[in-house]
Amino acid sequence: MIIVLSPAKSLDYETPAHVESYTKPAFVDDASELIDGLRKLSPQDIATLMDISDPLARLNFQRYADWSPTFTPANAKQAVLAFNGDVYEGFDAKSLSSTDLDYAQQHVRVLSGLYGLLRPLDLLQPYRLEMGTRFANARGKDLYAFWGDRITRALNEQLETRSGAARVLVNCASTEYFKSVKPKLLAAPVITPVFEDWKGGRYKIISFHAKRARGLMARFVVENRITDPNALKEFATEGYAFDAAASNDSTYVYRRRVGE
């Protein structure tokens, strides 16, 4: 089983990492190519391209300037400890043991606009480059064209080491990021968990809660060493419960009612 997550815009380089082990990202050469292109942009270009504030554009202009193809604990941090958004509050990697993180290293992947595909312990230098950014490059009009089938092939290399029910991809990424994966070329079926909360008289996806729940699901897989997708139906963290009637073989729906 491989579970894929989206990255986070918010980053934490202040909190010291509680583990020393780390690995190097697989697509450093590709990331370097993107950085070379990003360095040609002015802060105003970055603000316009990414629809961000001038201070944030200046911050990322400097990040691109500082970025190095050499990764060390001095200039980078393990990805799953550096990302700090809703998904990663749910995953809460800083409270996982080194043994748990070793398991996550084999079963969790993070999709990234700059780095393509990251393992949890891959070193990450600070950046901002969302997968949906229409950043024209030598390979095409945007990052989907840039990555092509590279991410899918990298996932297949991992999936092909699994067998039976364990050869499955669990999609806990956003639509924007999972578009970088080509399901028809995958060497495994895809299961997408969907998290819904009761609000306004019906169940609906509430972005903040759904993002957090994706991280909780990834943690559930890691802590329980899950390899069989049927075991995902036992997920019941923070009030969610699997709804068989609303689910099918490729979409697992989890619902909850809070405060009723």
Swiss-Prot record:
UniProt cross-references to NCBIfam families, sorted A to Z: PRK02101.1-1, PRK02101.1-3
Gene Ontology terms: cellular component: cytosol
InterPro entries per UniProt: YaaA
Name of the molecule in the record: UPF0246 protein Bcen2424_2223
GO process annotations (BP): response to hydroperoxide
Family: Belongs to the UPF0246 family.
Domain of life: Bacteria
UniProt source species: Burkholderia cenocepacia (strain HI2424)
